[in-house]
């Protein structure tokens, strides 16, 4: 029926199924309930853990890269969101993040009027009108309208 009764209180996105809603909420909560027994790395979705487990070298990579990641994460982040306290390295990142709280959607589709908080989301959406699928999987050749869909798909190979 197209009904989407589950609404995210953080960003306003709607979902048809509770499972989709729960998975989405992990973006905001940072919850990662699935963990690798070998290296302890945590994942927000079971399929990410399964992908990780199918690539054993990733565990060693993770352990060696952990120090690099920690140093990367220690980069100064002087721009703080007054709503939730999240910090950013650039003021433009903070500004973009704050749209989640304000609901500001300054990028509108000329075709249907649907509005988006970011330019990239609008560009992805516009591909649904044109039918253009500019993102191609190098493994199997399957094409996608959105880069995120391609990235998600590539995890199955």
UniProtKB/Swiss-Prot annotation:
<keyword id="KW-0479">Metal-binding</keyword>
<dbReference type="InterPro" id="IPR036236">
    <property type="entry name" value="Znf_C2H2_sf"/>
</dbReference>
<dbReference type="GO" id="GO:0005667">
    <property type="term" value="C:transcription regulator complex"/>
</dbReference>
<keyword id="KW-0804">Transcription</keyword>
<feature type="zinc finger region" description="C2H2-type 1">
    <location>
        <begin position="6"/>
        <end position="28"/>
    </location>
</feature>
<protein>
    <recommendedName>
        <fullName>Oocyte zinc finger protein XlCOF2</fullName>
    </recommendedName>
</protein>
<keyword id="KW-0677">Repeat</keyword>
<feature type="zinc finger region" description="C2H2-type 4">
    <location>
        <begin position="107"/>
        <end position="129"/>
    </location>
</feature>
<dbReference type="GO" id="GO:0000981">
    <property type="term" value="F:DNA-binding transcription factor activity, RNA polymerase II-specific"/>
</dbReference>
<keyword id="KW-0238">DNA-binding</keyword>
<keyword id="KW-0539">Nucleus</keyword>
<dbReference type="Pfam" id="PF00096">
    <property type="entry name" value="zf-C2H2"/>
</dbReference>
<dbReference type="GO" id="GO:0000785">
    <property type="term" value="C:chromatin"/>
</dbReference>
<comment type="function">
    <text>May be involved in transcriptional regulation.</text>
</comment>
<comment type="similarity">
    <text>Belongs to the krueppel C2H2-type zinc-finger protein family.</text>
</comment>
<keyword id="KW-0862">Zinc</keyword>
<feature type="zinc finger region" description="C2H2-type 3">
    <location>
        <begin position="79"/>
        <end position="101"/>
    </location>
</feature>
<feature type="zinc finger region" description="C2H2-type 2">
    <location>
        <begin position="34"/>
        <end position="56"/>
    </location>
</feature>
<keyword id="KW-0863">Zinc-finger</keyword>
<keyword id="KW-0805">Transcription regulation</keyword>
<dbReference type="GO" id="GO:0008270">
    <property type="term" value="F:zinc ion binding"/>
</dbReference>
<dbReference type="GO" id="GO:0031519">
    <property type="term" value="C:PcG protein complex"/>
</dbReference>
<dbReference type="GO" id="GO:0000978">
    <property type="term" value="F:RNA polymerase II cis-regulatory region sequence-specific DNA binding"/>
</dbReference>
<feature type="zinc finger region" description="C2H2-type 5">
    <location>
        <begin position="135"/>
        <end position="157"/>
    </location>
</feature>
<dbReference type="InterPro" id="IPR013087">
    <property type="entry name" value="Znf_C2H2_type"/>
</dbReference>
<dbReference type="GO" id="GO:0006357">
    <property type="term" value="P:regulation of transcription by RNA polymerase II"/>
</dbReference>
């Amino acid at each position: 029926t197209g009904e989407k009764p589950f609404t995210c209180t953080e960003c306003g996105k709607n979902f048809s199924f509770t499972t989709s809603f729960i998975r989405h909420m992990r973006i905001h909560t940072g919850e990662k309930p699935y963990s690798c027994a070998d290296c302890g790395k945590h994942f927000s979705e079971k399929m990410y853990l399964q992908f990780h487990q199918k690539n054993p070298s990733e565990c060693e990579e993770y352990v060696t890269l952990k120090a690099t990641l920690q140093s990367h994460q220690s980069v100064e982040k002087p721009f703080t969101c007054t709503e939730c306290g999240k910090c950013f390295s650039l003021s433009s990142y903070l500004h973009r993040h704050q749209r989640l709280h304000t609901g500001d959607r300054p990028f509108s589709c000329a075709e249907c009027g649907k509005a988006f908080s970011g330019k990239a989301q609008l560009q992805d959406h516009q591909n649904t009108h044109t039918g253009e699928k500019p993102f191609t999987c190098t493994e199997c050749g399957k094409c996608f309208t959105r880069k995120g869909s391609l990235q998600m798909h590539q995890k199955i190979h």
